[in-house]
Amino acid sequence: MDLFEYEGRTYFITVDYYSRWVEIKLLTTQTAKSVITAAKELFSTHGIPDIVISDNGPCFSALLFKEFAAKYGILHTTSSPRYPRANGEVERAVRTVKGLLKKNDDPYLALLSYKLVSHQVSYSWEEDSELSSLSLQRHWHPET
């Protein structure tokens, strides 16, 4: 987890270390409360992680954030201020996203193009399925 600024806007970014999936949310403030709200939205979609790594920023070192992590059963680890590479996945994602934002006027289109291109899966599960993609999309399964 990290926060970064681009053109006067503050973004909350998270990276799943296993899949390298990136999630970004625009924040109105850099408070622990706004970070917790963004994290809760993320967790409601992807589940609660076992471990969260962040820097020692004020929003992550605040008592409110520590209480949130404890309540949700999250081990919160911080990277060393002198060694930010300890949170390298997020730092690399920040550089990538900033580069995309520079190339596109609409930040949402930039982020969408990043997700569509960089996270395509080459394996097609439909090839192994006897059901059509339409029946799978509609959650309808024929009787056997």
Name these PLM-found stretches.
Residues 1-97, 120-144:
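Retroviral integrase
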Residues 101-110:
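Short, charged, surface-exposed loops that flank catalytic or proteolytic processing sites
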